[in-house]
C-alpha cells in the first residue's frame, strides 16, 4: 500500500539524531515525516542521563545556535549544571548537565509536536525504495510505502543489534526494544562498507538501598549555567546533587576472577567499544596498576529512584554484577533495578559519505548518528541537524552546506569521519580541533546563527535576540575604547588597586582590560566605569575578544593561509594514477578515501605536503582548479 501523501524528507529513527534531523528539515519548510518504531520513546536517553561535557557541550551550543532542540530541552530537564574547566581559558570551558530523563524526553516530544510541517508515524522501517541509485522512499514493516526524494537514516544501535549479558546474548536495539534486522540486511545489499561496533551501559541501582553518607557529595554550580542562548536559569527544575564513590581491590578481584565469563574477553563480542568510555572489566585489565576507579553516582530524575553509576559499564553475568556493585562503598546493600549490558550493532564506513552526510552511492540518502560510527547524544544530534538540513537543501535544489573545521566542532566531527573514517566509536574532544580559541562554547551563536538564519533554521525570536546581543557587543566595545583613565583621574586609586604596577600614563578601558590581572567585572565595579548594559553573555564576549585579540588575529591568519586550497575540489572520478610523482602508497590511500577536496586529502594519514603539491600542479595544468561553495 502506498501512503496517500508524498513527503519532501523522511527521517527514520527518533533518537537524538533523528529528532534534530526532522526538526531541521521541517523548520526549513519541508513536508517532513519522522518514522519511529515507538512514539513513546522519541528523544529517549538510552544510556547516561546527562548532556554536554568537554567537546560535547560545544556541539550542543552549536546545535542551539542553528535553532536545534537539544540545549533548550536540557535547560528544561537539567537537574544539575556545572561548568567544566572553569579555571582554564574560555576555549576549553564546557557546560555539562545532569538530566531528569522524563523531563528531557517530554521537552523533546513537546518540541516535535509543536513543529509545523512535521508529521510523526509509528512503524519500523524495513526497506528502502531505490531506483537507478536514487532513494525514492521507504517501506515499513506492514508494507506501507512512503515516498520522498530525501531520506535520512538515524537508526542508532538498532541495525543488527545484539545484546550481551555474560555469555548469553539476544537480539535487541536496546534493552526493551527490538532490533532492526530487515533494514540491516537491506543496507548490506547496497555498496557500503559495513562493520560492527560495541557500546555498553552500567546496571541501574535503587537509590533507596544506597548509603550516601559514605560517599562524597558533588553539588552543581552557583550561579547555575544555561545551555541555550535563549535560556535562563528560571527554566531549570529543582537542582539536586550527584555523589562520588570508588571501586576497590575487592571489586577488582571479583572482576579478575570472572573475566572468562565476559563476552568481551571470551571472544563472543567482535565489535570495538568506545576508547574513552571503557567497561569496568576493560579498565581493570588495561589499568592493572590502579587500586581504585572513580564512580559518579548520578540520579536519573526528580521522580525516579534509579541511579546511574557512571564508571561501571559492564557486560559480565548478572550474578557477577551484583558482587561488583555490593563491593563498592555505599552500595553494600544496593539493589540492582536493571542489569548492565553490552550491545553490538552495524555501522557504515563514514568515508562513503559526502561532507553533507549524503551517501556517495545512493543519491538522496543521508546517514547521521551511530550508523556513522560515533558515540554520544551530542555527536548524534549535531550530525542529525546537518543531515536534515542538507536533505532539505537537496529537495530545494540548493548547494549543501557543512561548516568547515575552523567554523564549528560539528565541522571537525564530520570532516574527521568523512576523511579518516573510524575503527572505534568516535567521541568529540576539544583536542580534535586545531582552532580551539575560535571555536568556543560562548561564541557558537556568533559563528553560526547568521548562517542558520540564511538557511531557514533560525526563527524570528532567536534572530531578534541574536541581533540585540550583537548590538550590545558593538556598543560596549566602542565604549571601552573611547573611555580613558589618566593618572589624576578621580578613581585612579581604585584602578591602581587592580593593577600590578600603577598607571603612569593615560590608558583606555580597552587597554586596561588587556592586562592579564584585570577582570571586566572588577573594572566595571568602579564608580563611573560601569556599563549601562545588563546582557552578561554579550559583556563576556567583549572581555574575551579584548583579552585574546592578538591570539584571535594570529589564529585567523593561520586559517586564511590554510583556506587557500582547503576547498579546492578533487573531481569525483579523478584518476590519481595519472598524476606523475605520486607513490603507489599515496595513490592507494587516495583511491580508498576518495576525498572531496584538497583539504580533506591533506588530512589523510600518509598524504604528504609534497603529494598535495603534485595534485595542485596537476589540477592547474588540466584546468580543473575550482573551489566548492
Swiss-Prot record:
GO molecular function annotation: flavin adenine dinucleotide binding
Listed GO biological process terms: tRNA methylation; tRNA wobble uridine modification
Domain of life of the source: Bacteria
Binding, NAD(+): 273-287
Primary localisation category: cytoplasm
Needed cofactors: FAD
Residues reported in the UniProt entry to bind FAD: 13-18
Gene3D superfamilies: FAD/NAD(P)-binding domain, GidA associated domain, C-terminal subdomain, tRNA uridine 5-carboxymethylaminomethyl modification enzyme MnmG/GidA
Sorted UniProt keywords: Cytoplasm, FAD, Flavoprotein, NAD, tRNA processing
Any GO CC annotation of this UniProt entry: cytosol
Compartments it resides in: Cytoplasm
Function: NAD-binding protein involved in the addition of a carboxymethylaminomethyl (cmnm) group at the wobble position (U34) of certain tRNAs, forming tRNA-cmnm(5)s(2)U34.
HAMAP family, per database record: MnmG_GidA
Similarity-based family: Belongs to the MnmG family.
Binding partners and assembly: Homodimer. Heterotetramer of two MnmE and two MnmG subunits.
Annotated protein name in UniProt: tRNA uridine 5-carboxymethylaminomethyl modification enzyme MnmG
Gene: mnmG
Amino acid at each position: 500500500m502506498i501512503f496517500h501523501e508524498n513527503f519532501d524528507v523522511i527521517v527514520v529513527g527518533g533518537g537524538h539524531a533523528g529528532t534534530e534531523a526532522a526538526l531541521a528539515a521541517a523548520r526549513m519548510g519541508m513536508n517532513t515525516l519522522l518514522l519511529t518504531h515507538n512514539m513513546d520513546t522519541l528523544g529517549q536517553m538510552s544510556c547516561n542521563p546527562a548532556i554536554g561535557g568537554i567537546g560535547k557541550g560545544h556541539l550542543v551550543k552549536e546545535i542551539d545556535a542553528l535553532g536545534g532542540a537539544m540545549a533548550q530541552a536540557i535547560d528544561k530537564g537539567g537537574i544539575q549544571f556545572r561548568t567544566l574547566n572553569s579555571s582554564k581559558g574560555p576555549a576549553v570551558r564546557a557546560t555539562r548537565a545532569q538530566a531528569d530523563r522524563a523531563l528531557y524526553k517530554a521537552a523533546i516530544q513537546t518540541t516535535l509536536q509543536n513543529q509545523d510541517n512535521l508529521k510523526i508515524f509509528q512503524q519500523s522501517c524495513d526497506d528502502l525504495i531505490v531506483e537507478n541509485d536514487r532513494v525514492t522512499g521507504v517501506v515499513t514493516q506492514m508494507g506501507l510505502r512512503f515516498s520522498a526524494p530525501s531520506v535520512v537514516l538515524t537508526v542508532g544501535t538498532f541495525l543488527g543489534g545484539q545484546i550481551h549479558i555474560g555469555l548469553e546474548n539476544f537480539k535487541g536495539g536496546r534493552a526493551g526494544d527490538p532490533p532492526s534486522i530487515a533494514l540491516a540486511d537491506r543496507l548490506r545489499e547496497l555498496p557500503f562498507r559495513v562493520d560492527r561496533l560495541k557500546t555498553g551501559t552500567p546496571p541501574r541501582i535503587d537509590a533507596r538501598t544506597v548509603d550516601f553518607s559514605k560517599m562524597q557529595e558533588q553539588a552543581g554550580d552557583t550561579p547555575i549555567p544555561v545551555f541555550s542562548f535563549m535560556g535562563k536559569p528560571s527554566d531549570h527544575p529543582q537542582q539536586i546533587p550527584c555523589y562520588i564513590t570508588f571501586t576497590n581491590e575487592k571489586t577488582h578481584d571479583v572482576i579478575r576472577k570472572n573475566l572468562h565469563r565476559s563476552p568481551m574477553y571470551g571472544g563472543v563480542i567482535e565489535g570495538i567499544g568506545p576508547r574513552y568510555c571503557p567497561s569496568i572489566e576493560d579498565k581493570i585489565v588495561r589499568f592493572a596498576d590502579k587500586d581504585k576507579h572513580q564512580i559518579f553516582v548520578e540520579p536519573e530524575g526528580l521522580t525516579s529512584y534509579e541511579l546511574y553509576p557512571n564508571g561501571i559499564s559492564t557486560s559480565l553475568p548478572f550474578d557477577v554484577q551484583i558482587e561488583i556493585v555490593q563491593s563498592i562503598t555505599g552500595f553494600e546493600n544496593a539493589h540492582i533495578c536493571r542489569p548492565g549490558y553490552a550491545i553490538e550493532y552495524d555501522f557504515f564506513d563514514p568515508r562513503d559519505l559526502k561532507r553533507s552526510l549524503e551517501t556517495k552511492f545512493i543519491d538522496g540518502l543521508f546517514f547521521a548518528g551511530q550508523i556513522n560510527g560515533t558515540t554520544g547524544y551530542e555527536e548524534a544530534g549535531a550530525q542529525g541537524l546537518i543531515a536534515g538540513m542538507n536533505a532539505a537543501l537537496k529537495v530545494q535544489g540548493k548547494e549543501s552546506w557543512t561548516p568547515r573545521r575552523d567554523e564549528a566542532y560539528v565541522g571537525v566531527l564530520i570532516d574527521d569521519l568523512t576523511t579518516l573514517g573510524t575503527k572505534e566509536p568516535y567521541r568529540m574532544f576539544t583536542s580534535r580541533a586545531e582552532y580551539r580559541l575560535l571555536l568556543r562554547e560562548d561564541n557558537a551563536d556568533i559563528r553560526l546563527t547568521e548562517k542558520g538564519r540564511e538557511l531557514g533554521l533560525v526563527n524570528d525570536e532567536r534572530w531578534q535576540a541574536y541581533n540585540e546581543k550583537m548590538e550590545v557587543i558593538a556598543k560596549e566595545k566602542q565604549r571601552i575604547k573611547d573611555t580613558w583613565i589618566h593618572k589624576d583621574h578621580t578613581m585612579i586609586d581604585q584602578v591602581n588597586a587592580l593593577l600590578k604596577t600603577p598607571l603612569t600614563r593615560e590608558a583606555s578601558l580597552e587597554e586596561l582590560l588587556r592586562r592579564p590581572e584585570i577582570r571586566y567585572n572588577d573594572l566595571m565595579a568602579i564608580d563611573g566605569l560601569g556599563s549601562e548594559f545588563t546582557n552578561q553573555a554579550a559583556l563576556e564576549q567583549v572581555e574575551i575578544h579584548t583579552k585574546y585579540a592578538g591570539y584571535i588575529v594570529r589564529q585567523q591568519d593561520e586559517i586564511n593561509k590554510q583556506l587557500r586550497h582547503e576547498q579546492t575540489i578533487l573531481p569525483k572520478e579523478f584518476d590519481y594514477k595519472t598524476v606523475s610523482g605520486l607513490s603507489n602508497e599515496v595513490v592507494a590511500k587516495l583511491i580508498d578515501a576518495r576525498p572531496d577536496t584538497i583539504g580533506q586529502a591533506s588530512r589523510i594519514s600518509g598524504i604528504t605536503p609534497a603529494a598535495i603539491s603534485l595534485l595542485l600542479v596537476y589540477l592547474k595544468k588540466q584546468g580543473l582548479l575550482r573551489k566548492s561553495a
